[in-house]
Amino acid sequence: AGVSSVSERWDPDKKCLIDLLWDLWKTDDPDSPRPHVVHRLDKDTTGVILFARHGEAQAALRQQFMDRTPQKTYHTLVEGLPEPPRGDLTCHVEEHPGKPGTMRICRQGKECESAFDLQKAYDHHSWVEVRPKTGRTHQVRLTMAQLGSPCCSDPVYGSGSPLLLSTYKRSYNPGRGEEERPVASRLGLQPSKIVCRH
């Protein structure tokens, strides 16, 4: 989390995930080629991501993503309880013209389709499995926000509030004069599985 998958346009000198992976590869083989991007993750997301060792593999993997054949599974901790608790959601999205780098629902936008399934409900939050069928920017985050249960700690599509122990354990007291520290303050979203041909 906190590292871009690829170089950022506005800060091309900042280390990205490709640079870090390449540095690692070069410790074993100084002549190792630079990794190739197959897909991207949001900067605040941690989990499974694919890179290719050479251009031929990149082209083959990217074609699979264009054909929508990889099976992607995400798990997310969300605010509240999604309604309905399972199903498919199809909407249309576009980049938000007033907020660069974010998306919004728009009838004329690109199709965004996801399947979702409630795994566990808690008092104030839920654990949900999401299987995106398309590959839109912020797709899982938008899907959950559309269902009325944005991803925890999502500052763009949700409240952005961190998870506090006092939310779950009413008797919790951080101590006199101490401020309660969050149990989790980063985006509650993780890609957990990608199934593809390789």
Predicted regions and their residues:
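RNA pseudouridine synthases
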Residues: 1-198
